[in-house]
């Protein structure tokens, strides 16, 4: 801003011009009177108007810089103690205190444009490519879309040497060797990159902060997830094992092969250290943890996998398995002790290692997990009341020649009581049968299974009971797996429950009939059914034994009596 009128001064000083000013230019009192910016009344008196003059030394020095940079210059105003001098100093404001060099240019950046990228490359993977590069300002990826037939990326550097070094390194890899790379000098878009603490984590453009060689960054990256909170002294203690890292690296489905990045080995060294040798290793974060999306689950995610999460991934057993011992009377988990050291201990271990255990959810609804592989530990389930069935329970149709039966996948909890676990045999006990069950319907259902031999059905006061015999044990195991949880046409309290019988059909156990009867009565009070013998249903002559306790699943609570 300058003071003066074009009518009073022949050649006014233009701020946007590059014209040099002479040795000394003074604004006289007559010139100031013609100015529309300064009232004429303030000039009356003995004010020393000649105190305001241009500084030739400052002008010459600034004019020389303006010619070299192509930028406008400003003249400084000498301070004065007179009223007009103070007024003009205020009017000129920042011009008197302007720095010698005033520029409107941006810092120079160099962009590495990479074309013909893999079509399935994600912004996260493209960013991790330059994770250990130096002088990186921003990384952008334009994936394949309707407008872009070929994916291309852009990495902005603050120096050309860093861009050239990154280009040479990428061309030597197997993934980027087929890509075309161009270095763009004086990249102006780099001035608009986000260098503040708030970075944008979008899928099309990912910007991250400048990586320093002397400190570990703690700013948010990729959707405000704090990935670099831990210092470098936690590398050895928090580094996951080689097997776990390689597994997470494979699950990330990254197209970046082993030539670019590898999971850390037991020694904790990274192959990327050789790739970007100029960047110091000050991050405990491994590439496998960055790319494994299941690892980043919360904003406060830590790159160190917890012991519990590692065990869950290795064993595949969720903590909800403890609900398997729910009681039908109290709905409270009861502790059980194994009194058998032989087969029961083996079945407990096999139950703990089952990758898809049949669980009973805490909200009394059915779980939708797939049925587990057939093991003795999952062959018998606890009963449940009708109130535990959710109205929105998904059912799957099971077709047969007789009609369509509904099947509940993983609908019943696993019974882990050692007293209810019988070894596999060729006879299956059918439990949870409604009072109006038809023998013909059961025959039609089980006759569809391979190896079906015969069926023994008996109706007692507490409900029907049924045993199905197959040609051999494998056929019985296959039928148990296929028909477990199938709903009959008259089912009201869930599907049928299948389990192995204590002894084959028609074969009497070594114990006497009286002892078996007493044991069956005790099992009724404990809610167990697997200890019922088929010899109590059939005598030696093949007829039914009249002295027999009903093999219902519990007591009168089963049918609401």
UniProtKB/Swiss-Prot annotation:
The yes or no answer to whether the keyword RNA-binding is present is yes
Q: Which GO terms describe its cellular component?
A: cytoplasm
Region Disordered: list its residue ranges: 192-259, 295-316, 344-424
Keywords of the record, alphabetical order, are: Cytoplasm, Phosphoprotein, RNA-binding
In-chain residues carrying the UniProt-annotated modification Phosphothreonine: 193, 218
Which cellular compartments is it found in? Cytoplasm
Q: Name one GO biological process term.
A: mRNA processing
Q: Sorted alphabetically, which InterPro entries does this protein's record hold? A: Nucleotide-bd_a/b_plait_sf, RBD_domain_sf, RRM_dom
Q: Which CDD domains match?
A: RRM_scw1_like
The entry's function note states:
Acts as a negative regulator of cell wall and septum deposition.
Name the chain's protein.
Cell wall integrity protein scw1
